[in-house]
Amino acid sequence: MPELNFRAIEEKWQKRWLEAKVFEPNIKDKPKEKKFYITVAFPYLSGHLHVGHARTYTIPDVIARFKRMQGYNVLFPMGWHITGSPIVGIAERIKNRDPHTIWIYRDVYKVPEEILWTFEDPVNIVKYFMKAAKETFIRAGFSVDWSREFYTTSLFPPFSKFIEWQFLKLKEKGYIVKGAHRVRWDPVVGTPLGDHDLMEGEDVPILEYVIIKFELKEGDETIYLPAATLRPETVYGVTNMWINPNATYVKAKVKRGGKEETWIISKEAAYKLSFQDREIEVIEEFKGEKLIGKYVRNPVTGDEVIILPAEFVDPDNATGVVMSVPAHAPFDHVALEDLKRESEILVKYDIDPRIVEEITYISLIKLEGYGEFPAVEEVQKLGIKSQKDREKLEQATKTIYKAEYHKGIFKVPPYDGKPVQEVKELIAKEMMEKGIAEIMYEFAEKNVISRFGNRAVIKIIHDQWFIDYGNSEWKEKARKALARMKIYPETRRAQFEAIIDWLDKKACARKVGLGTPLPWDPEWVIESLSDSTIYMAYYTISRHINRLREEGRLDPEKLTPEFFDYIFLEEFSEEREKELEKKTGIPAEIIHEMKEEFEYWYPLDWRCSGKDLIPNHLTFFIFNHVAIFREEHWPKGIAVNGFGTLEGQKMSKSKGNVLNFIDAIEENGADVVRLYIMSLAEHDSDFDWRRKEVGKLRRQLERFYELISQFAEYEAKENVELKTIDKWLLHRLNKAIEGTTKALEEFRTRTAVQWAFYSIMNDLRWYMRRTEGRDDEAKRFVLRKLADIWVRLMAPFTPHICEELWEKLGGEGFVSLAKWPEPVDEWWNEEVEVEEDFIKSLIEDIKEIIEVAKIESPKRAYIYTAPEWKWKVYEVVAEKREFKSAMAELMKDEEIRKHGKEVAKLVQAIIKERAFDVKRIDEEKVLRESKDFLEKELGLEVIINPEEDKGGKKRQAIPLKPAVFIE
């Protein structure tokens, strides 16, 4: 057979689907009970989609196709997300001829150079990648209703008006507030940064440091060294301070809330703190070594402690000033031990080494399993020798901090006897009330980079608009909705619950980037994670909106909040429709149809997306739905999928390690890509794309095509007399139908592929071996039935070649709309499956015996089946499932009693292996019917149950595991 031209087949069926509008559902076709509405997070168009994205979009398409074949009226729409600063940032970097950005777009995304330079205008980036993404989705065979396509921002006014309506509703309900809040901030562009505005670091948490002001006296002047800590309670155990002698520090006037103080902090800290409600005026710059050997006063205990040198202090983390608590901090203990050994460092700074030798550790916390100084014990336990054992030190620190926080009891008055987690809050609060401590926000890691290419800082913003996800009543509604929803996989539910609990105010607008202006404060633009939470409702009416736009019959400015209120929130009213016709210019009957569509499709059945969107988009999706819509319109389910890697490496466009989705289709064909992605991992697990494996799957798919093409020529004559092996294949087909259906209902796409493709392929291979040389009507009937079912089972995964094969099979219409297979009652036959498994297992056992025993030139296989009394033992044990009662019952049988010890051993073995569901078959009959096949497969003469007990093997036979002797 010539090599299969996947591209030609794909183009043929994509064209036919679009021409016939196969995937544009009509709500008049089926009752609401038979509707199925599924959506996936629309892609952000700052570049080409890669094969990781391919998985996110293929999963819902497979489910949509499956439900369509089950007889549901399926809506699977698509739109495009272009909101925010990333696209503007890319345009800016291309304008500035940033080499790395140009390399990504020219070499990784393969944008022609003459088009690349037009990307200085962000609108051209949007147009180019929107066209490319749609082409990719069509080429992938996605069953999208393109009549509902739209994109975000004020560039598409109807959707922008919908977002204005959403925000007016949120504000009306008190969920949008104005105030001060900490946000990620691009200090160059001057804008807050949402998750989607970051090139790197979207998962990096913001830490809240307590900075404690240790006092340094210089003449009459009081200068503060603010030490940053995540453990304010340990201020009682400070033995010294750490400063990096090689880092640059500044003396600065710090003004905050009408109060002015002089601080010494790292140069980097001065910059960061200037964004956090402080005016910083640098007076002097110097190296940290200037401070070494000086003494500062602990503002809580009054102790004077020495400043010691430590190169481990990172000036770019918090204030660059660190307090040392060696009893409870492994790093501090090890650093002091290193200084004791390397006293020449101290001498360099005119510090008497005896000062460090005589430092006394202060025990603060009682911790079960540890003595006075937990940090010291943990360091000894892990065999840490010096600060160079950084990995072990990190481990020790995590262990001690976690244990002390969760189980530690504080020992120092006035907090003695209280749990550490309670004391931590009390001490921090008390210090701040006294003015000896403040808060500083810092990223847990440094790699937080905006899409403009700038390193982010944390800024306290005033007069910023926020969505108040911390509102307790709103949280309660979100929890109620989540409790009613299906979550796939269910293991993700706890994560959603936790996020609902900790979610707080979130900045919802910025002053740069593409988007929809806030309706009441238009200098602010709604950001990308805030305008993408309820657009699934907009899809339900977008077909009508698009048609009106194309016909020039729509004035978006007339799409007032009143219009959206009626469509999405109110009851049907002919009077209201007539009123709105006058106000909007939209005919009343079309307004009525829009409302009908919304009421038909809502609630949304499934929302699909990658697991990275659980902490933001997917949780915001729940919150915004419960805020705006009636309870009967709250979403019903969320399905989450994992990530993709490429040849074992994380995909990264910035490193060029990325495979564009469209390139994967070009190289392999859409059906190969789809099947490969679906076969690699269950939806929540991560997958790894390997080119070699893709090639192997392509050949298997070509074999599938070849087999169905061959079987299409057979005639499926009914009422033929089937042989046992024919019945076996039909039974296995029933199992494949059942297995595929169940897996797809639960979004377990890998299991579905195992059943729909590999299981049938393996069963067919076995059937062809068992029926070699046969070409009768029964075989042709079975293979023709298999072809008809197999093509339909595979259609959600490989729709193009299945359409082609369906046509060859003479199927009616499109396979995409064909009836999903259902098991045929009369095909069920567990007995024949047990019989075939028995034969397969026997062949494997005999081959293994020959190999292990290294039998050269074997001639004969003597096979002994289990005697009747052993079957009885299995049946009794299956009923009793307990040794004593089974033995008591068995010993009533005179025949069985003769085999006393053997019976006891067999009962113990059955119970140990829990082999309670062994199905009885006539082993000898099965063997005699399969004798010719066994001899051909094994190349041996097969002798069944001879009188002679060859090699004394006979007694080893147990049900479904015959004894075998080879000679």
Swiss-Prot record:
UniProt-listed Enzyme Commission number(s): 6.1.1.4
Gene3D superfamilies, A to Z: Class I aminoacyl-tRNA synthetases (RS) (3.30.2320.20), HUPs (3.40.50.620), Isoleucyl-tRNA Synthetase, Domain 1 (1.10.730.10), leucyl-tRNA synthetase (1.10.10.720), Valyl/Leucyl/Isoleucyl-tRNA synthetase, editing domain (3.90.740.10)
Placement of sequence motif 'HIGH' region: 43-53
Ranges spanned by the short sequence motif 'KMSKS' region, renumbered to the chain: 650-654
Primary localization: cytoplasm
Residues binding ATP, per UniProt: 653
Top-level taxonomic group: Archaea
Catalytic activity: tRNA(Leu) + L-leucine + ATP = L-leucyl-tRNA(Leu) + AMP + diphosphate
GO molecular function terms noted in the UniProt entry: aminoacyl-tRNA deacylase activity; ATP binding; leucine-tRNA ligase activity
One BP term from GO: leucyl-tRNA aminoacylation
CDD domains to which the protein is assigned, alphabetical: Anticodon_Ia_Leu_AEc (cd07959), LeuRS_core (cd00812)
InterPro entries with a match to the protein in the record: aa-tRNA-synth_I_CS, aa-tRNA-synth_Ia, Leu-tRNA-lgase_arc, Leu-tRNA-synth_Ia_arc/euk, M/V/L/I-tRNA-synth_anticd-bd, Rossmann-like_a/b/a_fold, tRNAsynth_Ia_anticodon-bd, Val/Leu/Ile-tRNA-synth_edit
SUPFAM superfamilies to which the protein is assigned, alphabetical: Anticodon-binding domain of a subclass of class I aminoacyl-tRNA synthetases, Nucleotidylyl transferase, ValRS/IleRS/LeuRS editing domain
Compartments where located: Cytoplasm
Any Pfam family matching the protein: tRNA-synt_1
Entry keyword annotation includes Cell membrane: no
Aminoacyl-tRNA synthetase listed as a keyword: yes
Keyword tags: Aminoacyl-tRNA synthetase, ATP-binding, Cytoplasm, Ligase, Nucleotide-binding, Protein biosynthesis
One of the record's GO cellular component terms: cytoplasm
Top enzyme class: ligase
HAMAP family documented for this protein: Leu_tRNA_synth_A
Record family assignment: Belongs to the class-I aminoacyl-tRNA synthetase family.
Protein name: Leucine--tRNA ligase
Source organism of the structure: Pyrococcus abyssi (strain GE5 / Orsay)
Lineage, opening ranks: Archaea, Methanobacteriati, Methanobacteriota, Thermococci, Thermococcales
